[in-house]
Amino acid sequence: MNIQEEIKKRRTFAIISHPDAGKTTITEQLLYFGGEIRDAGTVKGKKTGTFAKSDWMDIEKQRGISVTSSVMQFDYDGKRVNILDTPGHEDFSEDTYRTLMAVDAAVMVVDSAKGIEAQTKKLFEVVKHRGIPVFTFMNKLDRDGREPLDLLQELEEILGIASYPMNWPIGMGKAFEGLYDLYNQRLELYKGDERFASLEDGDKLFGSNPFYEQVKDDIELLNEAGNEFSEEAILAGELTPVFFGSALTNFGVQTFLEIFLKFAPEPHGHKKTDGEIVDPYDKDFSGFVFKIQANMDPRHRDRIAFVRIVSGEFERGMSVNLPRTGKGAKLSNVTQFMAESRENVTNAVAGDIIGVYDTGTYQVGDTLTVGKNKFEFEPLPTFTPEIFMKVSAKNVMKQKSFHKGIEQLVQEGAVQLYKNYQTGEYMLGAVGQLQFEVFKHRMESEYNAEVVMNPMGKKTVRWIKPEDLDERMSSSRNILAKDRFDQPVFLFENDFALRWFADKYPDVELEEKM
C-alpha cells in the first residue's frame, strides 16, 4: 500500500445544522450513494419502525433527534469518505465541538424555509475559528421556502462568510422544477424520466415558465454583482460554495457529493502543545481521542474510544504511547464504523477515524504516539456546565450498576460529575436539560440502574487552587465540590454570591473554564 496515495484519497468532514434542518436525512443519502445502505428512506419513521442508520441509540430512535456523533465511512469516486454526523440539539454542543476538532471540512445543512438558525450560527463560529472549509446545502426545496437571494444575503450578513452558488433552484415547493447547475453548466430536472438536460434546452423545456425567467434574471445579477469563485478562498474558509436541493427526495445530493469531493481538502496536520504542526505524511503514527462512547453494542457493555489518525499508518497489533499516563497500550482490537455496524480493521491512515476498544485506559483528548515520540496534541475544548442535579441510586442493591454507569457516561463527556467535598454526594453538571434526560434514560436502559435526580438549578462554576483552599470558605451559597479529576471547585448560587466571595477573599484567584 502506498501510504501517501492513500492519505491523499481521504476526505473527513462533519455535518452541522440546527435541529430538523435535515442533517440526518442528507447523511442517509450520502451513505446510499456510497453503497452502504440499500434504502435511504424518510428518517423519522417512528410509526413504520424505519430509523436513520446514523441515529443508532435507542433514545435517538424514539425521539427522532441525534444526541451523539455517529461516525460512518464509505468509498465513492476513488475517495475514502469519513462522515461525522453530529448532534444538532444545542444541549449536545460539547460532543459536537469536540467532533469538529477531528475533521478537515464541514457541511452546513440549512432549512431553506427558515434560513440561518441559532444552533447553526453557534456551530459555524467553531468551524470559522478553526479555519476549515464550509460547504452549504440549502435543503427542503420540495417545500416552499425563502427566496434564494435572501438566503445568500443572510449567510453573508449573519455568518460573515462570502458565498458562491454552485446551482440555482427553478421554483420551489409544489412548483419546484429542478436546478440550474452553474458549475456543470446543465439543468438538473426534478420531474420526468430524464435527470439532466443542456442549458440550450431550457427555453424549450420550460417555455415561458415565470420561475425559469426569474432564474435567468437572478443568474445575470449574480454574474454581475456576486462573488468570484475561488478554490483558495474555499480552502481558507473564506468562501462557502452553496448547493440547493432536497435531501428527502434525494434531489441535488449526488451532484453536491461529486463537487464536494472535488474541492474538499485532504487530511491536514494538527497542532501540538508546543505549537508545532504534525504533518499527516509523517511516517510515525499519531492520533487523538475525540470521543468515547459506551454501549454501542448493549449486549457486550463495550466502550469505544474514537481516534482521529493525524499522521502515518495504523497497523493492527501496534504498540502506542499514552503521554498523559506515561504508559503504553496495544491496539489489537480496532474497528471502523457504519453507525452501529462495524468491522475489524487491520490498516488505516491519516485522516481516518478508528474505534479502539477501551477498558478504561483512555480519556477524551488523549494523544497516541509511537516510538520515542511523547508529545501531546493541543487540548480539546471543555465546557463549564450551567445546570446541576443531585443524583443517587434508587435501589441501594444496584450500587454496582449505578457506579459503573456513572463512570462510563461521565468518561464519554455526556455529563460532568462533581462530588460534594464534605458529604461525597454525587452532582451532575450539564449544558442543557436534555443531557439529564438522556443520562437518566441510558442509566436505566443500558445499566439497569434507576436513578433519583433532584434539580439544583443554575450554578456559576469556578475552580480554586488546592493550596488556596480552606473548607470554611464553603457556605449554602457556594457549595464546595471536587470535579472528576479531584480538583476543588465552587458552585456559586449566582453572580452575587461570586462577587461576595471575591470581596471576602480578595487574594484568592478563581479560575473560569470555557
Swiss-Prot record:
Signal peptide: none
Primary localization class, coarse: cytoplasm
A biological process from GO: regulation of translational termination
Domain tr-type G: 8-268
Localization in the cell: Cytoplasm
PROSITE patterns: G_TR_1, G_TR_2
Disulfide bridge map: none
Pfam families named among the record's database cross-references: EF-G_D2, GTP_EFTU, RF3_C
Gene Ontology molecular function: any one: translation release factor activity, codon specific
This protein's record includes keyword Cytoplasm: yes
Keywords attached to this entry: Cytoplasm, GTP-binding, Nucleotide-binding, Protein biosynthesis
The keyword Iron is annotated on this UniProt entry: no
Chain positions recorded as GTP binding sites: 17-24, 85-89, 139-142
Cellular compartments per GO CC: cytosol
HAMAP family, A to Z: Rel_fac_3
Stored NCBIfam families: prfC (TIGR00503), PRK00741.1 (NF001964), small_GTP (TIGR00231)
Function comment: Increases the formation of ribosomal termination complexes and stimulates activities of RF-1 and RF-2. It binds guanine nucleotides and has strong preference for UGA stop codons. It may interact directly with the ribosome. The stimulation of RF-1 and RF-2 is significantly reduced by GTP and GDP, but not by GMP.
UniProt record similarity statement: Belongs to the TRAFAC class translation factor GTPase superfamily. Classic translation factor GTPase family. PrfC subfamily.
Name of the featured protein: Peptide chain release factor 3
Source species: Streptococcus pneumoniae (strain P1031)
Taxon lineage: Bacteria, Bacillati, Bacillota, Bacilli, Lactobacillales
